């Protein structure tokens, strides 16, 4: 049975086209029925994934081709979702490494490939987007080889097969000058080079939970590869957690993947990726085994969190006006539910019952969680992200990252100056002779907080920025990444008036427009100078019954700056919070009243 199964993961850098490639594999294998709707990026099922064009959660599918069953797992390309990538590697026997035919290997390519090599997996290299203008497949293959050598690949891993594809056009081939109008060369390579699962069908059942899903009808669904034996509906099993604790359970349903559907089956066999229901309180890494075979599988290792934020109950004067879930109990329940499947996330309660410490793999990892909660109807406040330092040999160290910037040559000077302020160390500079240049830096993770939004404004949206963890090193200057300018703070609650805002424009850039509801302590603009300024934005023009001798000056307001969630989180300083509700993102001071802020500053200086 297991000789006709192939388990592979698709890994790639963000936006190198692996989800689109998977679309074509699904469509051309005949997995879809005639009546089924065929949309783009089928596997990105989450709204945020479709909007941002990135994969956040790893997902399973399977295709049938020439009497073979190919189980495919689509993985995130971003290092912030490394916890997802790590778990997937334990389920598969080979990887499809998708690399852009123009860009070549990028920081995330290195990150996901390193994970695959850690598990001893041999890659099949797919050079995608071969139809791109100026594509350079030969150069890309050389770059991939160099990357593998740098990652200490074995001789077997260095002898990798290469397939050239254009996922958009649905073409593939072993020679980019002689492409076929279908994906058959890629199917053949998967069958030929991906090994069949190394499992034992005769021994008693054993599998490890690598993913969790939830369904209101079926309850908790555990997903993993059957390591040995087989499992049927209503079988009694023993669950062993990562700490070795045992408990008994009964399997309610055994499910299998076919295309985008989960289908109920009578029996799951060794080597196959299946889902089981009926076992509550499952956790990632749990071993499910036959009661007579109590042997736990090694626990899955997950990267430690690097960023910490505080989530708290919304305490602003506008609290409860927009959200459905606003209490600390509801927020804590939602965070605990998230940790069930989001294993790289850590939640700790603090001395204050309304504040929770949340740690994750990066700014993006946590902002995706906040955005999901916001869309579900939660109101909360979040602090500025703080990098988690690590003590090594009694010395405090902070994480550093490899940062790759792809920019237009005309922006090179301003970008290098911008990174110089953040103490970046230039490692490499590669012009492409077509008006763009690639800069490679080592930069502290602290300097990357709020980096991307400022970088995008410097490059007018044309720059590309990628980063992945490099190493831990000595602490740098404590003020790295802090905002240089002060802010404009509202001194009262009410409706902002155009007349006041017009007069405030010369003081800085505004975040609100005429008619916006504001409250005391809310940040309404960026000050031109380094100090904070408390201002009145509610006063209208004084009217008298005397006829004016001249004409009124026309009030023209410049367009207000509106922050996305990531931009707001990157903008704030340590004494500020982002208020997140289903319809609004506001920035406020931690202390809303001016006298409280002054007292806090005095206390800070006296320490």
Swiss-Prot record:
Q: Which NCBIfam families match?
A: small_GTP (TIGR00231), TypA_BipA (TIGR01394)
Q: What does this protein do?
A: A 50S ribosomal subunit assembly protein with GTPase activity, required for 50S subunit assembly at low temperatures, may also play a role in translation. Binds GTP and analogs. Binds the 70S ribosome between the 30S and 50S subunits, in a similar position as ribosome-bound EF-G; it contacts a number of ribosomal proteins, both rRNAs and the A-site tRNA.
Q: Can you name the source organism?
A: Buchnera aphidicola subsp. Acyrthosiphon pisum (strain APS)
The domain of life for this entry's organism is Bacteria
UniProt: GTP binding residues: 15-20, 128-131
Gene giving rise to this polypeptide: bipA
> Catalytic activity, per the record?
GTP + H2O = GDP + phosphate + H(+)
Q: How does it assemble?
A: Monomer.
| Keywords noted in UniProt | Cytoplasm, GTP-binding, Hydrolase, Nucleotide-binding, Ribosome biogenesis, RNA-binding, rRNA-binding, tRNA-binding
What protein name applies here?
A: Large ribosomal subunit assembly factor BipA
Quote the InterPro entries the UniProt record gives: BipA (IPR006298), BipA_C (IPR048876), BipA_GTP-bd_dom (IPR047041), BipA_II (IPR047042), BipA_III (IPR047043), BipA_V (IPR035651), EFG_III/V (IPR035647), EFG_V-like (IPR000640)
The record's subcellular location field reads: Cytoplasm
SUPFAM superfamilies per the UniProt record, alphabetical: EF-G C-terminal domain-like (SSF54980), P-loop containing nucleoside triphosphate hydrolases (SSF52540), Translation proteins (SSF50447)
Q: What class of enzyme is it?
A: hydrolase
What EC number(s) has UniProt assigned to this enzyme?
A: 3.6.5.-
